[in-house]
């Protein structure tokens, strides 16, 4: 399983790891977050015999969006989870279309993989029109904040196909939400795996009602933050595509442990410290929204 995209890779890998562990699978993961070609290669070496035979049956690989082009040439992949595409690391990637094209070209090297795409991201979902792979979609059917207005800054304000401005029925965060182009008709699909309502959002968890490919479930996401609801539903899609049963999928989401710096909480004297890693404008904005509600 390969996880790529701008935000959510490391946390998603933690959920996937919990799912494979609970399912009794033999696997390894590049847990240190070394997600360039050198780090991915080192992970395979560390989990292989001296003659090059892998000691495990499966791998969960976090992969940098740009490095995926090279990595995809050397691996067999069952499932690819693309979390989202946002403006990020402009010194490396330039505009968001560069990141999108890098992922798209990488996926084309793995035509037999099932690809899980964020239906709420107009950039990410656009790949479904240009790749031969089987597609599974995930998303959030409702806004996290019913009073939320359109974001002042959007990484995808205009249709990727015809350049007309999108209309939105609702926003979740950034450019994610119920997008639709009134000119060419490109729009958000109804996701295969969808959060239908958000019942509770706390500092350390969220409770959602989710439709997992037709089955409605109440799920407690074992980490706070709106964007981690996306990570959870994306992993539900990826684990199901991998063949993990629904009960184990839900169990993984409800009991996984977060990664270093990802909504990490610890005590400093009598105070609780929240350690939250941010790397780009979209992530920073969501972190500010989270902190103002604590």
Task: Describe each region flagged by the PLM.
Residues 259, 277-294:
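Active-site beta-alpha connecting loops in nucleotide-dependent enzymes
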Residues 26-31, 218-226, 272-274:
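A short glycine/serine-rich beta->alpha loop
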Residues 186, 201-203, 238-278:
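Gly/charged, well-structured mid-domain segments that form the phosphate/adenylate-handling core
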Residues 74-84, 176-190, 220-254:
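A conserved, hydrophobic alpha-helical segment in the catalytic core
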Residues 1-139, 147-150, 154-158:
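Phosphate-binding loop of NTP-binding sites
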Residues 16, 20, 40-44, 232-242, ...:
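Buried hydrophobic packing segments
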Residues 10-19, 199-215:
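Acidic-glycine-rich active-site phosphate/pyrophosphate-binding loop
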Residues 140-204, 222:
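Cys/His-rich short segments
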């Amino acid at each position: 399983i390969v996880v790529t995209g701008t935000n959510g890779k490391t946390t998603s890998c933690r959920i996937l790891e919990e799912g494979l562990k609970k399912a009794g699978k033999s696997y390894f993961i590049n847990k240190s977050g070394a997600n360039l070609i050198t780090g991915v290669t080192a992970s395979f070496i560390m989990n292989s015999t001296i003659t090059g035979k892998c000691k495990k049956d499966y791998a969960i690989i976090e992969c940098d969006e740009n490095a995926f082009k090279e990595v995809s040439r050397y691996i067999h992949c069952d499932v690819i989870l693309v979390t989202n595409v946002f403006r990020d690391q402009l010194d490396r990637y330039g505009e968001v279309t560069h990141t999108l094209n890098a992922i798209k070209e990488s996926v084309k090297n793995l035509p037999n993989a099932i690809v899980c795409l964020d239906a709420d991201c107009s950039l990410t979902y656009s790949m479904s029109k240009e790749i031969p792979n089987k597609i599974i979609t995930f998303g959030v059917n409702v806004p996290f904040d019913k009073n939320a207005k359109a974001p002042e800054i959007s990484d995808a304000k205009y249709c990727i196909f015809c350049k007309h401005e999108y209309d939105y029925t609702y926003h979740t965060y950034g450019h994610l939400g119920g997008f639709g182009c009134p000119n060419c008709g490109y729009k958000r699909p109804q996701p295969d795996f969808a959060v239908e309502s958000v019942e509770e959002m706390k500092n350390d968890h969220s409770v959602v009602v989710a439709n997992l490919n037709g089955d409605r479930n109440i799920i407690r996401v074992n980490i706070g933050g709106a964007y981690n609801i996306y990570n959870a539903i994306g992993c539900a899609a990826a684990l199901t595509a991998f063949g993990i049963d629904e009960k184990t999928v839900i169990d993984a989401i409800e009991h996984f442990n977060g990664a270093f710096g990802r909504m990490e909480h610890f005590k400093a004297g009598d105070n609780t410290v929240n350690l939250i890693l941010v790397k780009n404008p979209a992530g920073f904005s969501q972190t500010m929204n989270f902190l103002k509600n604590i």
